[in-house]
């Protein structure tokens, strides 16, 4: 239930580019309960890293993950 799920907020955003090969998934933080919007990348190692959604490498990584995670069409 989205109403009762805990909200994860990012208070510090990395400025360091993360290699696309290390990324497994992402989710956007857009809750009004959070001080800033962010993208949380989950790495293959299981770490969660907050990033600035407007940064060019973040947008490139998101589109890379979207393409990678699309199920092949029959």
Swiss-Prot record:
One of its GO terms (biological process) is positive regulation of cell migration. InterPro entries: Chemokine_b/g/d, Chemokine_CC_CS, Chemokine_IL8-like_dom, Interleukin_8-like_sf. GO terms for molecular function: CCR chemokine receptor binding; chemokine activity; heparin binding. One of its GO terms (cellular component) is extracellular space. Keywords: Chemotaxis, Cytokine, Disulfide bond, Heparin-binding. The N-terminus is blocked. It comes from the Eukaryota. Pfam families: IL8. SMART domains: SCY. Disulfide bonds join 9-34, 10-50. PROSITE patterns: SMALL_CYTOKINES_CC (PS00472). Gene3D superfamilies: 2.40.50.40. Belongs to the intercrine beta (chemokine CC) family. Chemotactic factor that attracts monocytes, but not neutrophils. Augments monocyte anti-tumor activity. Also induces the release of gelatinase B. This protein can bind heparin. This is Monocyte chemotactic protein 1B.
């Amino acid at each position: 239930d989205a109403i009762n799920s805990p909200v994860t907020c990012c208070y510090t955003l990395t400025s360091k580019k993360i290699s696309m090969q290390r990324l497994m998934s992402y989710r956007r933080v857009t809750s009004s309960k959070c001080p800033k919007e962010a993208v949380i990348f989950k790495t293959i190692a299981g770490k969660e890293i907050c990033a600035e959604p407007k940064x060019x490498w973040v947008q490139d990584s998101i589109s890379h993950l979207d393409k990678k995670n699309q199920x092949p069409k029959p």
